[in-house]
Amino acid sequence: MEKQYLTVTALTRYIKTKIEYDPHLQSVWLKGEISNFKNHSRGHMYFTLKDENARIAAVMFAGHNRNIKFKPENGMKVLVKGKISVYEASGSYQIYIQDMQPDGVGNLHLAYEQLKVRLEEEGLFSQVYKKAIPPYAKTIGVITSPTGAAIRDIITTIKRRYPIGNVIVFPVLVQGESAAPSIVQAIRTANEMGEIDVLIVGRGGGSIEELWAFNEEMVARAIFKSEIPIISAVGHETDFTIADFVADLRAPTPTAAAELAAPNIIELQEKVLQRTLRLQRAMRELVHKKEEKLQVLQKSYAFRYPRQVYEQKEEQLDRALEQLVLAKERYIDKKVNQLKQLSFYLEKHHPSQKIMQTKVAVETLQKQLQREMQTLLQTKEFAFVRAAQKLEALSPLKVMMRGYGLVYDEEKQVLKSVKDVSLGDAVSVQLQDGILDCSVSGIEERELNDGK
């Protein structure tokens, strides 16, 4: 019987079919620890689920993971629901997860803690960014559900405390999937209006699921970016939402938020009354002091004898004018003297005087130079004449004029001894007026006696 060989693809598909048709593997509840977690740019999640003895590859596509509130991380223990299948390309089986919950802690609670830590690290909770609530807001915006006790409590409290204030309500959804985008849009709209002084954002109490819109990241960032100060009023005395941490001020209830946003008109009236009384008292004291000062002035010499005071002041003015005239004349005399001194100095140090002095000095130096040049020239001429006379006395031509001559050999070398020639050598004799060509016909040596 001939053997039938399967391809790897055929075998893998067979195994995949077997697994996918097994009802026990199409709805699997599994718990384990996440490792090798990767969040793909398209939104899919890839990771490994493991326990002490085994591991399995896991995939959670974007269509399913967008519903989870927390952020999966390595080391996190989770409870998952999914189905088992085979990834043909690698031949490995894996679980395709449809739902995932944290193991041991609630899904929403974990998501809350993760977002709280992340936003706090970014600085969204810092007091540095908190805006002051205006003490006398003219227009108060309220972002909440248009129905329910919260909006009634807020409006009733504001109108009771501050009836002259304006209230603008921005109706929104406060729970459900559409609640967070609705709240974000209302915050943006209030900021764009440009007339809201303070915003109250909140709702009545409820469970964590009902309050979850106020734990959404988009709501937290919208509150942080708001130019209008925001008071959060979610309605839980003890529990805090993410919105409470980001808001500029947190109120435990909607009624408390209204009291923080709107001043008490009775207290304002009391303040106005107290300040009016203080102002009146201060004005009375000021008028009293001015009256006393006026009485003192009325009793003064100037008020009682104004003509004498006028004459005294007129006399003082005349003296002051005389002193001013004298001072002016002294000042002018002083400046005239200074001008004369400057003129004398300039005349003394005028450039023409300096030029004349320099010209005389140059002429004197020129005459001195001429005398010294003449003396030097005469000295040089005298030295030259003496040197010429000395040279003339030593000149061979001078000796020749006395009958002497110079004898040269054929190579034009001066002969100094009879030993320098031989019989028959040609020699030349230079006299003062010419040269004789001769031939040696005889040689007679003589002894020198003291050079003679």
Curated annotation (Swiss-Prot):
Coiled coil: none annotated. Its EC number is 3.1.11.6. GO terms for cellular component: cytoplasm; exodeoxyribonuclease VII complex. The keyword Nuclease applies. Belongs to the XseA family. Keywords: Cytoplasm, Exonuclease, Hydrolase, Nuclease. It catalyses: Exonucleolytic cleavage in either 5'- to 3'- or 3'- to 5'-direction to yield nucleoside 5'-phosphates. It is found in: Cytoplasm. It comes from Bacillus cereus (strain B4264). One of its GO terms (biological process) is DNA catabolic process. Bidirectionally degrades single-stranded DNA into large acid-insoluble oligonucleotides, which are then degraded further into small acid-soluble oligonucleotides. This is Exodeoxyribonuclease 7 large subunit. GO terms for molecular function: exodeoxyribonuclease VII activity; nucleic acid binding. Heterooligomer composed of large and small subunits. HAMAP family: Exonuc_7_L. It comes from the Bacteria. CDD domains: ExoVII_LU_OBF. Pfam families: Exonuc_VII_L, tRNA_anti_2.
